[in-house]
Amino acid sequence: HIYGISKLIKAEDQFSSFDYENDNYLFEIKSRRKAYDPWIIEQLKLDTNIGLAESVKKDFIYVNEFEGFLYIWNISKLIRQDYDFRFHSRKMPWQTDFDRTQTVNKMTGYLYNKDATIVDTKSTNP
């Protein structure tokens, strides 16, 4: 157990909206090539994972990884605290790593580093 979190279980379906789960949480984990502040979160992914998490009485955790740093937000907790994601329509690539020329409008919001738990995995000894 790291940080008191029970063992993570990988989602069985490769097309699942979340990546891992444990007794208390659903996790979506993204590895990024750049660090941002704010980070972007898609409203559809947020809504889907919040709905799933609530249906199984868990919290939804969103993690962005960049060069060994984890930026972690408890989205369920932020919603309970009336966090303003500032959702708006934004033109984005249809898919992250494939055809970058095809774009689509997506509803996106923001997550700020000041609202994240930031973990340096390179200097942490569990």
Residue ranges and their predicted role:
Residues S16:
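Beta-rich catalytic cores
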Residues D19-Y20, Y62:
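Short beta-strand scaffold segments in enzyme catalytic cores
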Residues H1-A11:
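Acidic-basic catalytic patches of nuclease active cores, encompassing PD-(D/E)XK
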Residues V56-F60:
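Short glycine-/polar-rich loops that comprise or flank the Walker A/P-loop
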Residues I2, S55, F66-P126:
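Non-catalytic C-terminal interaction segments of nucleic acid-processing enzymes
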Residues S31-S55:
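Mg2+/Mn2+-dependent nuclease catalytic core
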Residues I9-D13, Y62-N64:
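Short beta-strand
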Residues Y20-A35:
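Conserved catalytic cores of phosphodiester-cleaving nucleases, focusing on short active-site segments
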